[in-house]
Amino acid sequence: MSFPTIAHCIKSYTMIRYNYLCINEVDMINEVVSVKMPVKEKIRILKNHFEPENATGREARLSLVTGIHGDELDGQYVCYEVIRQIKAHPELLTGTVDVYPCINPLGMDMGARGIPMFDLDMNRVFPGDNNGAMAEYVAAEVVNDIIGSDLCIDVHSSNVYIKEAPQVRLNEDCADKLLPYAKIMNADFVWVYSSITVREATLAYSLNKLGVPTLVTEMGVGLRINNAYCRQLIDGIFNIMIELGIWQGERPAVKEPIMSTEGQVDFIHAEHAGLFVSALGEQMGHIKKGERIGDIISPVDGEILQEIISPADGIVFSLRENPVIYKGTLLARVYAVR
């Protein structure tokens, strides 16, 4: 598959964000929900709906959601590329695809993780309330629109502090149902969470409880687009579409992910405040027990305050990106091969 430049991605995102309706042979941009704001403005959540030319209404349906956090931009490129490829080959579409590129448009406009002014994480208000405040109302309408999908993929980037390798995260309560999809998602890593740690007000938790199988993907770092990670996930999405009978294109080559449970993941935290300097450069991946992950240094007295050492043979799949750290800051996650 060919991938255009980020400039094309931004141009496409601008069109999707501000156009109200666009109809051609296979796609239609619909307004999912709108809420009036002060000074004659309003929040509008849009989706791009695709179906085959001779749809019967019995086709499998995939929903692709991103932009819940306004500082997560990888999903914008992913949406662009999925839309571009479907529009380039509508004859290969045999099912329904709904693309929701921006659930938190206020946050996206400001580059803020949550909803500006309200200091609210959009991913803590699902499944929402049709009679609730603005965020709850929007969340409820989005959930209602997604219900009926055969599968939902909720695409996230990390925040501006931690870089994540492409991964799928699952609640162990839903693992049996979701693992077959997670394994063909072209991720480096599949992390199965304990149900004790699950935040119940997330989109994924709510949809899974409502009967819509939902995968959560994480990759990259906030306010950036990692082309390689996006392309990896895009191949995974088309692989899923082929598996669901939604797409008749050539099946992409996907990697076999590393499978994990929470007990196999080591969390490495800082013991000192200072600057974290990675010894891994831009690369995460395999590491041996005792190898350096990085150092915490003091720019005042020129000393290494803490050497960050891998506690086990394994895979580094999360790594501190912002170098300014404090005692207790998460520096890395290592999947330990025991």
Which residues does each PLM region occupy?
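Structured catalytic-domain cores with a bias toward divalent-metal coordination
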Residues: 2-338
